[in-house]
Amino acid sequence: MWLLRCVLLCVSLSLAVSGQHKPEAPDYSSVLHCGPWSFQFAVNLNQEATSPPVLIAWDNQGLLHELQNDSDCGTWIRKGPGSSVVLEATYSSCYVTEWDSHYIMPVGVEGAGAAEHKVVTERKLLKCPMDLLARDAPDTDWCDSIPARDRLPCAPSPISRGDCEGLGCCYSSEEVNSCYYGNTVTLHCTREGHFSIAVSRNVTSPPLLLDSVRLALRNDSACNPVMATQAFVLFQFPFTSCGTTRQITGDRAVYENELVATRDVKNGSRGSVTRDSIFRLHVSCSYSVSSNSLPINVQVFTLPPPFPETQPGPLTLELQIAKDKNYGSYYGVGDYPVVKLLRDPIYVEVSILHRTDPYLGLLLQQCWATPSTDPLSQPQWPILVKGCPYIGDNYQTQLIPVQKALDLPFPSHHQRFSIFTFSFVNPTVEKQALRGPVHLHCSVSVCQPAETPSCVVTCPDLSRRRNFDNSSQNTTASVSSKGPMILLQATKDPPEKLRVPVDSKVLWVAGLSGTLILGALLVSYLAVKKQKSCPDQMCQ
């Protein structure tokens, strides 16, 4: 970093000092373009110049180099229009350094000085922001799959491969129009303040109806496509028209618009169908208000992809009991039966296993407990009814939200709740608790997509939303705990435990005995006190 500062300081200092002893040489005009991956720097000779300029650059050690085509160092020199020279240097070039969120490259123009000695006649520090949004080069499938007759020019020829791909377009040196749009959506935000949006019909499946693609906020003739082929449609319009919105935040101005398309509807004698999803394309260009430069951000927002195709297959479910409220670990098969005290909390989790579809949602329909492994056996006690806590229990079930975590990438595949342990009562003997195991069971189903209104419901008297919509569910399945729970009475009864009735005669005898004992203790205490307070001769 110190060396870089020294190099920059030396370059700046040489500019100031050499200004006094600068040899007579033609002035040059130059233009810098910050591309997605490289500098594009064009130097133009004025009319007095007799020879093309020679470009030079300083490396990180401060050494001077004449620039030439060097793929190892990421520099290319080509002749531009007229007598101009164009330099293209990648941001990973040997002569480029990262500095204060920018890529910088000190360059110069070399000319003839006194006695025909070569001297640096012009110096410039190329500087491009690092956060300039880079467009990905189109995939080869997006380019090769377009027939030559359907290709829509992206930029006029001649143009280099780097410049073309820097625009997010396809390149073919064998074609007359060497730079053309790929099978996708390509957005350009121009320095002059225009949108340029190219849409391929194959950006969706089935393909788009191109003649139905239009701007959502304005549909007059001035906002119609400027060019169309069988495979593409191209919109170009200024930021001040076609319903474009502008929002200024600090130093940034954001211009936004939206494209929509009509669905392809097939009409039959008994109804109409469509196989198209909704097409809505949101585009955005951001500019710096205080700088007359290229856009600082270009974004295309498409709707989420359609849900993946489903196939029939087994759905594996699991009901587990966690060892604590954090759900950090669970009881395994070898840990059962789980021994708990009455009124202890039990933390339950029901999960979908071996699925990676983020759109799946797990629904708990009914959950209940039985004294045997048979979920249909009697007696039964309801825990959840239609996914909500059973309101007839004075210790109501608590629904626990599931948060996304590193070990839980699909929270919609899990449902959690806690219950307070209880014991079944013998129906033949009044208020006699049945001793033995308690098994948990749940009936569950799956809905899609998860966390949408069709998959949630608000439980009565609860603010928490629960999954519930029979129209979006598959067949209900059942799952049970891996083993039973053995419930024990606590060694110390809680305050609300029922009192045992006691005979009044027993209470009377106990009270009289307590009174006599207290009286004897009082007499003994007074005697001892009197003995300590009197002199020995008087107490004898």
UniProtKB/Swiss-Prot annotation:
Keywords: Cell membrane, Cleavage on pair of basic residues, Disulfide bond, Extracellular matrix, Fertilization, Glycoprotein, Membrane, Receptor, Secreted, Signal, Transmembrane, Transmembrane helix
Extracellular face residues: 19-505
Pfam families: Trefoil, Zona_pellucida, ZP-N, ZP1_ZP4_Ig-like
InterPro entries registered for this protein in UniProt: P_trefoil_CS, P_trefoil_dom, P_trefoil_dom_sf, Zona_Pellucida_Domain_gp, ZP-C, ZP-C_dom, ZP-N, ZP1/4_Ig-like
Positions annotated as propeptide: 463-540
GO annotation, cellular component aspect: collagen-containing extracellular matrix; egg coat; extracellular region; plasma membrane
SUPFAM superfamilies: Trefoil
Signal peptide: 1-18
Chain ranges of the ZP domain: 188-466
Protein name: Zona pellucida sperm-binding protein 4
The organism of origin for this protein: Homo sapiens (Human)
Taxonomic classification: Eukaryota, Metazoa, Chordata, Craniata, Vertebrata
Gene label: ZP4
